[in-house]
């Protein structure tokens, strides 16, 4: 509950999104399909839309007002690193006052009625600084700011850890939820917020005797330490494969192949090829002989006994923690508040998805087997081994469905703004930033503008690669939405001698508050940061031209951003992307599907006057189904690893991995391999790795059934906005999906609902792994 920032950073994961809650070489068919759409109803690019092109494509510094001076994100106090540490201290003082107020709530019915509101305020008070510090830790180029952010983060997390197991807070919330007369006064958002706090308290062993709570804290600390060790091992280099030069004859890649041969002749030794290197990738895709590919595969999937021991100890400790709080397994404990609800329901989904995907994957493997037979000249179809996949079906980079001119970063942002105007009546507008407001000259500030309500939030775009910046793509929620005019903060009290600190914290929060037209109350508006690592535009090379996978990434991250902007709830604990782990990726994956529409792609045309009339170069890649099936198997392994089985003294993670592959897989397990020690999601997504598959299935169905025929239809966009995005995490995701698809049977979210989603086709045209 009070154990980390919100869904702070929705990050690109190599295979590690850490969710926070306040706590082709096949016989591939290129279908020449006519994609003819007369574009007559497009909204032309506005002055603001065209300004986005200039903003991102011109190699100049951030737009700044020459007169204004402020601190980070417009907070006047945050002009130097020490101020961040001071703000953390001030926040602790105010948070303690609010905690004391909540603890006294049973003295007054009026205060009991305010408990849920005050718990949410307490959460926001702490997360508002923690989330900002988390961004600074990952993006600020100045080491002194990073150090200050680390100190602030640690100070507030330490305080949060106290709140997590605070029996008094739990007892007050219990009194509220046990009183029907109070519960019936709670609106849907308030009730959902209360339940989130309640569940998180329960997961923290709050109702156990003191000795068991102490044990819970100890096990939780052990899990953090083991998790760090596991991730270090997962990212550690694997030992090289020793390849004989004679085994590399006939390499398809002549350039690197010749270099390797010359290297071997010069050294008079076998080649040492490190997994993950360009040489290793070249061998896996280009070596006609099987043996070097096999050797590289074995090396790439090797583990030390210590790495396996760390993982198994992590899994056992999680299971012990779950047993301590009365749950059968870590999966049972984790899935309570997810769409899936139970491990059985996850298996219902995975089994159905396997059954649906297996025929397509078998067909693809049969084609690979035919190619292998032709290659080796055998009389019978050979078995496809794990090291054959990339040789007989080398991965193709993602490509647009129709030929497109080079897409610059500014052009893509213009297209996004025009898309949001069609769908939601919302646009993006460049904004000046004051001196001191941003952490690097690369950072550009965008206003998110609703046609009826004006500015509804801000996006700070930090999109170019630089030294010291976090790698990958990420969406950081620095500030969540929350209603503030009914805070009644004057009743929080004060502390003699701490008036200046209290004022400092209050001023920090006051900057966030705004009154919107046509909406009751005053709200703090959402503020998000997009981090990417695109190439920087230069005067000599011109603007940044994005690869197609980078366009997909940007659409994905902007899906998260619009969820944050539109999900402006009264309670920050359910705002925007603060929703169930197995639902949060749905809006962002859906955004990728829009790139399959020629009509949407026409929005990249600045004049908006062209007729979309192209022959599509749509590429049906059969190997997609092999990859999807492999991901399903990993989700199955994740469930096994977080089941009661891990407490069996004979539990062996490698044996269980082999069992899943040999009983449910299509490609045989390779003895001597232990990929599980590199499966980083086992820590960040323990027991919930199925989530991305679930959201891909939902997004594919919503695209086909809701948006495909007319993706720019405003009525359809409004339906998605009103049935899904605006609720954030304040409504049952099953009810949202049910209403959006007009399928009432899904609303129960039961075992059959999970099976039904498992039977839906996952679109093969999008969903590049690793984008979150």
From Swiss-Prot:
Spell out the protein name for this chain: Mitochondrial intermediate peptidase
Q: Which Pfam families match?
A: Peptidase_M3
* UniProt-listed InterPro entries: M3A_MIP, MetalloPept_cat_dom_sf, Neurolysin/TOP_dom2, Pept_M3A_M3B, Pept_M3A_M3B_dom
- What are the boundaries of the transit peptide? 1-42
A single cellular component GO annotation:
mitochondrial matrix
Q: What is its EC number?
A: 3.4.24.59
Question: Which species is listed as the source?
Answer: Laccaria bicolor (strain S238N-H82 / ATCC MYA-4686)
- Which keywords fit this entry according to its UniProt record? Hydrolase, Metal-binding, Metalloprotease, Mitochondrion, Protease, Transit peptide, Zinc
Against CDD domains, the record matches this protein to: M3A_MIP (cd06457)
Q: Which GO terms describe its biological process?
A: peptide metabolic process; protein processing involved in protein targeting to mitochondrion
Catalysed reactions listed for this entry: Release of an N-terminal octapeptide as second stage of processing of some proteins imported into the mitochondrion
